[in-house]
Amino acid sequence: DYAHLCKTAQGITTEVTATPRTSCERYTFPAGEGHIILNLGQGLTNESGAMVRRVSSTEVEGMKLLGTFCYTTQAVFPIYFVMRVSREPSTAGPWKFQPKLQGVESAWSPDDGTYKLYENYHREIAGDDIGYRFSYDDLGEGEQVTVHMGVSFVSIENARMNLEAEQQGKTFDQLRAEATAQWNRDLGRIRIEGGTPDQQTIFYTALYHALIHPSIISDVNGEYPKMESGDTGKADYTRYSVFSLWDTYRNLHPLLTLVYPERQTDMLRTLVGMYEDWGWLPRWELFGRETYTMEGDP
């Protein structure tokens, strides 16, 4: 996929593309100072907590805890990442939000209730509201910085493996072209005739949305988090996640059976695998956890 975002108020142009298990972002800056900020702080789920560690001047690795949605269960699971920037930064380091202190303690801390930057700290840092920054002091007009990110639900090592396998040192433009070609192949499995251009756009937009979830959760080596336990399993097929089955059994999965049978087959094998992991078929599964969100059974 490819998304070209408009310029920000600071004049920064952002472009984003992806592979099944990695992402690539390209930032075009105006002349002067620029920053790449990794935010591992509070999210939209019922869990917080993260860790980030410096690997080199242009690479960090770490993890973030996630929870389920709608606050239905107290499940927690990690997502691991490896992040690289294409240009050597002027300065770099972790940051952390310092909670507001009470009484005389607040007068002792210059970072009270603000974000503290760690200039000369190069080991791991952990907490609820943390991140990492790459700062550039001398960017030329139109200079670009590319960010490469690999993720895994199993380990940092697998996140790095996914990044190496799926990006292989390719440029943003190469990855964008590959993503565009893949989406054209996927959407091109259905050819429509007639209708207005707007109606055709609506149709292919809906088909695009239908292919977003369920999404791949297994790594390039076949490893994945087992249902509920989170232990590492290994499959000889592509393992999927995000099964909103009460919504999708009526129409999405029949569509996949007709048009994308190889994906539907792997999804069915995934559901059987979840039963083997857990002893139950899922109702509304999210990243290896049962959310129990919807009534009844699919």
Region locations from a protein language model:
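Aromatic-rich carbohydrate-recognition surfaces in CAZymes
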Residues: 241-298
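Beta-sandwich/jelly-roll carbohydrate-recognition scaffolds of carbohydrate-active enzymes
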Residues: 1-240, 273
